[in-house]
Amino acid sequence: DYIFSAIKRHRNVEGIIFPDRSQITMTVPFMKAYTELLVESCHKRGAHAIGGMSAFIPNRKDPEITEKAFENVKNDKLREATMGFDGSWVAHPDLVSICKDVFSEHLNGEANQISFVPGYDIEDSMLHNFEIENSSITMEGIHTNIKVGILYMHSWLNGQGAAALFNLMEDAATAEISRSQLWQWLHNSVETENGETINESFMEEAFETVFSDINDIENIEKAREEFKKLVFDEDFSDFLTLPAYHLIN
């Protein structure tokens, strides 16, 4: 949600262009600053600091994917526990024990670590430091945003607010990040890592390429057209769900 908010509010600010969604991790400067501020703010007031949701989900038909999900969640929760969080949440019941074990080991018998009040001294500028080293905008990132956006919109229009996409549990925030990034790249004529300018013809071709892979999904056309409209419209809709409500049967 914070990533989406950052992109939305800075989408037309000169000099601020966000890279591929996969490159905006919890360890980049502005995300690290906000999580540190969260822990400090909560503990100063005697409140629990709860970490974010790990979107990774296991695949019981694919042990390799499941093992990778377990490892990712473990690393994610270890980072949170080390920062000072008191607990966290996950996207799938099979991951509860992993999350619990990490926090139990780190807390060493304590119910929480509220007594730990870090002195991070977060300044406003740190929350707006969007510099990400060695970042780029790739064709893979563009195609992924389009595909995730269309598939999530399709899921949402069919009554599912959370969708399992590519072994991740995605909600509206992911679709909003995808949509707002595509909008920013298109309406600011940003260049990809290969020097290609993202204009309307470029984006049209990208949509066609992605749609050719998913056009056999039932009733996918409505989702495609709505998501595409949100990307191409000059006016930036505050939330993608607002115009989509009119499409619900």
Descriptions of predicted regions:
Residues 1-249:
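Conserved alpha/beta-domain cores
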